[in-house]
């Protein structure tokens, strides 16, 4: 279902005025509280089996920081946190109007923007997630070329499938699995996919699921989305783990890898326009959690997600250390993060997931309404990082000007 996204000039001016008032409301919290609080219930969808969003939201839940910051803005907030196994059921709830905040990756976000769904991108939810092409420990599949004629599990319509197409594109020259007689089986449940069940020769797994299956079942990795080999690899680049594959340097996403993974927090247009101060409170709570967790031992951070990851601290720490949120220590979207959506849309055309790539204007529009709300949270939490941090040339992730400075973003096609 396509929903028309009508943004008329007058409506935009009214919203900007409202957003500005919301920022002032946060600063003038004692006065607002004295006048009584507005009761509001919001729903927040999270993916606790994934990466950084899991410990971050757990921290927010345990410390009720979303509720507290909303209280500072004059709200008596009740938060309904919901656990989702993947993006698909979240997207369904969101499109049907039954979810206020959700978090999912590049691939479903691009599809929604392409369909003109009225999504508002708020912040980076997690990123630089490691996906592993995995198989059984006794499998003769040792490299990407060995997938020809085989059956591979991947979450259709999600990031794992897109990762697979990019591995095929740069290793074999074509992103379409059908070009190599590869049958792709949908794997909505990562725990099951990680067992490499009968009828499946290999699967693309998220890192927590791979680590658990590797430790308990002996599931082995072939290559990962960062462009490095895993322990079961044997091929033109050599044998064993830790070899940078030459083909990854051809990727538009390098040095991030074959795929520039970013998951974003999404807000419904209704909540963004009717209660912008609540959106700023959400962002403030997220940044508070990210800043605090980034300073903690990664193994202890992973303990917040142990119920879902089921990993010992030394293994959970690997997931935490990969995540761009904890590398940065902040959650603000930048030009580099927006580019991830633009470039992903191009690869999705190659993979026949959408018919044409997004226009740069479409990507920017998806961030536009929430940009002033992010800026309010940035100011409230101490303005970290400074301008130099956004443009750090030595950073190992793609950055750039923050979303509230998108007027300085370059022209792209």
Regions found by a protein language model. Name each.
Residues 58-76, 162-184, 214-218:
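Ligand-binding cleft/hinge of the Venus flytrap
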Residues 346-413:
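Conserved C-terminal helix/tail region of periplasmic/extracytoplasmic solute-binding proteins
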Residues 136-151, 175, 274-277:
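Flexible hinge/capping segments at coil-to-helix
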Residues 80-92, 105, 178-196, 205-209, ...:
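Short helix-initiation/N-cap motifs at beta->coil->alpha
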Residues 1-14, 21-24:
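N-terminal secretory signal peptides
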């Amino acid at each position: 279902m396509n929903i028309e996204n009508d943004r008329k000039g007058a409506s935009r001016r009214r919203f900007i005025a409202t957003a500005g008032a919301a920022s002032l409301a946060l600063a003038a919290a004692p006065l607002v509280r004295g006048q009584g609080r507005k009761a509001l219930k919001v729903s927040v969808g999270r993916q606790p089996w994934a990466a950084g969003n899991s410990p971050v939201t757990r921290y927010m839940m345990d410390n009720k920081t979303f509720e507290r910051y909303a209280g500072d803005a004059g709200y008596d907030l009740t938060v309904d946190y919901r656990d989702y196994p993947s993006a698909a059921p979240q997207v369904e709830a969101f499109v049907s109007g039954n979810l206020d905040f959700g978090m999912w990756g590049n691939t479903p976000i691009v599809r929604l923007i392409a369909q003109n769904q009225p999504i508002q991108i708020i912040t980076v939810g997690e990123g630089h997630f490691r996906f592993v092409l995995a198989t059984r420990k006794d499998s003769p599949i040792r490299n990407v070329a060995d997938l020809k004629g085989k059956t591979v599990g991947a979450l259709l319509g999600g990031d794992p499938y897109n990762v697979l197409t990019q591995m095929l594109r740069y290793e074999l020259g074509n992103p379409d699995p059908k070009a190599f007689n590869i049958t792709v089986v949908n794997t909505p449940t990562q725990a099951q996919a990680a067992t490499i069940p009968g009828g499946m020769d290999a699967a693309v797994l998220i890192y927590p699921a791979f680590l658990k299956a590797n430790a308990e079942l002996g599931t082995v990795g072939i290559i990962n989305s960062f462009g490095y080999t895993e322990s079961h690899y044997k091929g033109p680049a050599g044998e064993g783990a830790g070899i940078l594959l030459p083909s990854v340097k051809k990727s538009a996403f390098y040095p991030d890898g074959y795929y520039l993974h970013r998951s974003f927090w999404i807000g419904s247009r209704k909540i963004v326009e009717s209660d912008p101060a609540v959106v700023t409170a959400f962002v403030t709570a997220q940044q508070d959690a990210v800043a605090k967790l980034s300073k903690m031992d990664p193994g202890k951070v992973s303990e917040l997600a142990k119920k879902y990851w089921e990993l010992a601290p030394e293994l959970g720490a690997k997931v935490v250390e990969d995540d761009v949120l904890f590398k940065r220590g902040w959650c603000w979207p930048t030009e580099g993060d927006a580019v991830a959506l633009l470039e992903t849309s191009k690869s999705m055309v190659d993979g026949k997931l959408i018919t044409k790539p997004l226009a740069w204007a479409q990507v920017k529009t998806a961030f536009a309404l929430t940009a002033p709300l992010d800026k309010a949270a940035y100011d409230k939490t101490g303005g970290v990082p400074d301008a130099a941090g956004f443009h750090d040339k030595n950073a190992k992730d793609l950055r750039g000007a923050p979303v509230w400075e998108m007027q300085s973003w370059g022209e792209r096609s």
